[in-house]
Design a protein with these regions (language model features):
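Short beta->alpha connector loops
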Residues: 6-10, 68-71, 127
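Phosphate-binding site of ATP-dependent enzymes
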Residues: 35-124
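A short glycine-rich, hydrophobically flanked beta-strand micro-motif that places a catalytic Asp/Glu
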Residues: 66, 74, 126-138
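Protein kinase-like catalytic core scaffold
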Residues: 24, 64, 84-85, 129, ...
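Anionic group-transfer/hydrolysis microenvironments
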Residues: 29, 68-69, 77, 132-134, ...
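C-terminal active-site "lid" helix and adjoining low-complexity regulatory extension at the edge
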Residues: 108, 122, 126, 135-186
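Short strand-connecting beta-turns/loops that link adjacent beta-strands
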Residues: 31, 70, 81, 136-139
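A conserved helix-loop-beta module that forms one wall/lid of the active-site cleft
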Residues: 1-36
Length: 186
């Protein structure tokens, strides 16, 4: 349950009055490290958060509203569609970003999450991305967001390896594109 909010406050209030579930999470489509992410408990709270975002930022980037699920944060890093790292971010607060979580651990992908990751990678066509998930109490997964500029530093001992994988992937892609252009010339 994710939807794009209108760019005027009267319409925002009308949109969220139709919500059947609060609290909801609000976030700008552009942000980093949990900035421009907040939670609202009712329609008035949503309007206040939107105003706050608009006052804090130079631009009025679109804002999305998302179902709130109390969950740890599950990050999956993919390079070229391949899962190269998982990081479970635990936090006592409702917001479990890489900057607020102090400990990370790996987690195993279940069959359902593997299917979702495959669909997400196919749909977004981003070579290197971090995909964030939450988990409902019933065990079902919720896609929170896809980051096109993901962090590589959840585990210090993997940082160098991940950078090398990313560079190898990008180099191979650049070579394939160059060859493809050459083939078209002939």
């Amino acid at each position: 349950k994710t939807f794009l909010l209108s760019s005027d406050l009267v319409s925002v209030r009308e949109q969220v009055k139709k919500c059947d579930q609060f609290p909801i999470v609000l976030k700008r489509i552009q942000g980093y490290m949990g900035k421009f992410v907040d939670k609202a408990d009712d329609a008035d709270g949503v309007v206040e958060v939107v105003k706050k975002f608009w006052e804090r930022g130079d631009d009025r980037f679109p804002i999305i509203a998302q179902e709130f699920v109390l969950s740890d944060s599950y990050r999956v890093l993919t390079i070229g569609g391949e899962v190269v790292q998982t990081a479970l971010k635990k936090n006592k607060d409702w917001k479990a970003t890489g900057t607020t979580s102090k400990t990370f651990e790996k987690f195993a992908l279940d069959v359902d999450l593997k299917k979702i990751i495959k669909k997400v990678n196919k749909a977004i066509d981003i070579d290197i991305c971090g995909i964030d998930f939450a988990k409902r109490e019933d065990g079902s997964w919720i896609l929170i967001e896809v980051n096109s500029g993901p962090a590589y530093d959840f585990f210090d001992d993997e940082f160098k390896m991940l950078i090398e994988k990313a560079l190898r992937h990008l180099k191979k892609k650049a070579i394939r594109q160059k060859i493809s252009k050459l083939v078209k010339l002939f």
